[in-house]
Amino acid sequence: MQDPACDVVVLGAGIVGICVALHLQKRGRAVVLVDRRGAAEETSFGNAGLIQREGVYPYGFPHDFGALLRYGFNRTIDAYYHPSALLRLAPFLWKYWRHSRPARHAEQAKRYSKLIEHCVSEHDALAAQAGASGFIRRTGWLKVFRTARERDKRFAEAERWREEFGVRSRLLDAGVLQEIEPHVAPVLVGAIHWTDPVSVDDPQGLGLSYLCAFERLGGRFVQGNAASLAIDGSGWRMRTVQGPLAASTAVIALGPWADVATRALGYDFPLAVKRGYHMHYRAAGEARLNFPMLDTERGYFLAPMRRGIRLTTGAEFALRDAIRTPVQLGRAEPIARDLFPLAERLDTEPWMGARPCTPDMLPVIGPAPRHKNLFFAFGHAHHGLTLGAVTGRLIAELITGEPPFVDPAPYSPGRFG
């Protein structure tokens, strides 16, 4: 029997699931949010803290032979792989490479940008409601360069994105960059200052604030087993620590763990993960980092957080549950110390998260093709935080029958058969 206090069960209390639950609760639905752990404790805890309005091109697989050769030696910071995982990952990587061909990548960017263009405004709306606007900083972020060749290439790209997608930026020479970041070593030749994005100085704090807003509206958060989701007549049932739960509609927003629920229902999405690591540091002396910053040629990211300076790494291609191997963090730390005066580590061990990725670089958002009253919201890769609020609104509109504010067709789960 359906729980009279539950219209919708949302599986997954990362930033995407929380935003889905909050948007549905705002629309008068009785929602229960379910996770095996606490809210925003996995990938949504440790990201780089960017809401990337400039991120109109999803992260593609390189086609440049030189880059492929460098990655093949497995010695870079921005990409690392487990050799033992390559056989399992090969079908995904092949499809990812094909979708990343320049012409195809440009097509996907046009589709992807329709979500990205709303990312800041949708988060602003939820943050205002949740009393969480203080987590959001409007400084933009810096993409910094060590060589004139890379700088000039990316400057031209930024100008194209301005013309095609309306993404604004400032192109900085070394002198201006040194003025706005005086504690960064003078080894850089310029930067792109992306001015439209915003950053978050405590990603988990933002997610928990959204959760509190959801609960103030009457929503419930419980712990439960996503693998127990099953059809119950015309609705759904599952097990939670508080007992059986039934609902008319279910949303799977489990990020890299989506297959825990989807495979049992007969869906085999071509998902893989890009794992990533972070570590916090105290800034040495009176040093201050004013902007989040990507060291482009080296492949790591520094961001000022409430806890300290967060160093995040690039993509690790591995099986989701494989042993942690923070190799990239070890490679990045001495280079980051040379760029900015980092003092001691503030975490006892590196944090690791997993980014859920599809080979065509678009998230999976929409109704399940073979089940009624089942919706999917996962596969956001590097942009779970960026697209969390957008996805929450879009899923809520699809469930309630409102006209969707973004055409959902490109992100349909049905595209994978």
List where the protein language model places each region:
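N-terminal Rossmann-like FAD-binding beta1-loop-alpha1 element of flavoenzymes
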Residues: 6-33
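Glycine-rich FAD pyrophosphate-binding loop
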Residues: 26-46
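Active-site substrate-recognition segment that forms the wall
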Residues: 47-50, 55, 59-99, 228-236, ...
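Rossmann-like flavin
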Residues: 90-212
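C-terminal catalytic lobe of FAD-dependent flavoproteins
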Residues: 165, 297, 338-417
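A conserved short coil-to-beta-strand element within the FAD-binding core of flavoproteins
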Residues: 172-180, 222-236
